[in-house]
Amino acid sequence: MPKTVVGVLRGGPSSEYEVSLKTGASVLKHLPEKYTPHDIFISRDGIWHSHGLPRDPDRILRKVDVVFNALHGAYGEDGKVQKLLEQFGVPYTGSQSIASALGMNKALSKKAFETYNLKTPRSVLVRKDNAGDKDLVEIFQTFPHPYVVKPVSAGSSVGVSVV
């Protein structure tokens, strides 16, 4: 019986590129012997590679049975690569594209949690194009110190500031 071919997606056009490479390398190293590993590297500029050569995603994905998604941040956790895998009919690890997109956006996630009466921290969505100094002063006066500031759609702790 042939072994299941597991494509391990790593790298990608994200600020979390380096950690994705490490995650993917660890998965490739520790994949049980009953599986055949297939390293799928995505460069910072979004070019997919297999066996060290640039390839179209569809050509690569035809050679795997399942994908282990080791991508982090944008493209890997925001529903984009999940949508692509769904379009090609390739099973993969992690949440489906809609859940991934929702989970990556903190404001949308908060609304979804509140719909189900789940407690969430008090917050305010500030957009750089519509928040003047006066608005920011008013916002900061209504919240206790310290303030935790985070981009609405960045992964992990990327962009987090405690002020």
Can you say where each PLM-predicted feature lies in the sequence?
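Basic phosphate/pyrophosphate-binding loop/patch that engages nucleotide-derived ligands
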Residues: 112-120
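A short, polar/charged loop/turn motif at coil->beta-strand junctions and beta-hairpin connectors
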Residues: 62, 120, 142-143
